[in-house]
């Protein structure tokens, strides 16, 4: 497997994780996530010990949706966790976890920084996704872009400073609010994937100097 193929595969994982945070799972998306190809993907991903528990929860939830009511319940989870903005939710914005302010504002420093990254790469948040640029879905989508268009050092820096720096705090908040556990599993898988990717991107220590 060439490095290009590896980077493409990494990008696909980031795109998948991004899509799960970007919007609720609708009927079409459910078909994609439970297709034969998707089942093979989940199976392969679950072989990694650090991913197994999260992947199993994601798969069991998706495969267990057999009617519109169950799909609507998952959509309600997404709305309640990410769209309402109350103490019983877990807003997926970096600024809420990285800012030193008691009441951090949206569209703050992290949003401005992320907007600049997008601008430098000639990218922008799509109009159908009216969210601040420091939304986790945007950051993961940008990381997917970096996988195929940037040096390892750039990817490593972005992961460490812009995603890994707050993801654990987000998960801590999310697990307190997520009664059904699907999105907690997605977030936990995201963190495990990010940690593994960081380890792979870090330069190997020299044996001699």
Curated annotation (Swiss-Prot):
UniProt subcellular location: Cytoplasm
Swiss-Prot/TrEMBL GO biological process terms: protein complex oligomerization; protein folding
Keyword Cytoplasm set for record: yes
Major subcellular site: cytoplasm
Gene3D superfamilies assigned: 1.20.120.1820, HscB, C-terminal domain (1.20.1280.20)
This protein's UniProt keywords: Chaperone, Cytoplasm
Cross-referenced Pfam families: Nitrate_red_del
SUPFAM superfamilies xrefs: TorD-like
Domain of life: Bacteria
UniProt-listed InterPro entries: Chaperone_TorD (IPR023069), DMSO/NO3_reduct_chaperone (IPR020945), HscB_C_sf (IPR036386), TorD-like_sf (IPR036411), TorD/DmsD_chaperones (IPR050289)
GO cellular component terms, A-Z: cytoplasm
Function: Involved in the biogenesis of TorA. Acts on TorA before the insertion of the molybdenum cofactor and, as a result, probably favors a conformation of the apoenzyme that is competent for acquiring the cofactor.
Family: Belongs to the TorD/DmsD family. TorD subfamily.
PANTHER family for this protein: CHAPERONE PROTEIN TORD, CHAPERONE PROTEIN YCDY
Protein name: Chaperone protein TorD
Source organism of this protein record: Shewanella baltica (strain OS195)
């Amino acid at each position: 497997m060439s490095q290009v193929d590896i980077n493409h595969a990494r990008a696909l994982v980031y795109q998948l994780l991004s899509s799960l945070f970007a919007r609720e799972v609708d009927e079409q998306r459910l078909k994609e996530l439970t297709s034969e190809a998707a089942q093979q993907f989940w199976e392969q991903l679950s072989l990694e010990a650090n991913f197994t528990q999260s992947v199993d929860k994601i798969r069991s939830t998706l495969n267990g949706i057999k009617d519109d009511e169950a799909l609507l319940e998952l959509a309600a989870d997404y709305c309640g966790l990410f769209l309402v903005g109350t103490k019983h939710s877990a807003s997926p914005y970096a600024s809420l976890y990285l800012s030193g302010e008691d009441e951090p504002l949206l569209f703050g420093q992290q949003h401005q920084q992320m907007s600049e990254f997008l601008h430098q790469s000639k990218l922008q948040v799509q109009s159908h996704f009216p969210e601040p640029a420091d939304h986790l879905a945007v950051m993961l989508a940008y990381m997917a872009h970096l996988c195929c268009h940037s040096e390892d050092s750039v990817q490593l820096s972005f992961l460490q400073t812009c995603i890994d720096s707050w993801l654990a705090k987000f998960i801590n908040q999310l697990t307190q609010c997520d009664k059904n556990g699907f999105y907690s599993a997605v977030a936990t898988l995201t963190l495990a994937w990010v940690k593994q990717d960081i380890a792979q991107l870090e330069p190997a220590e020299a044996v001699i100097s």
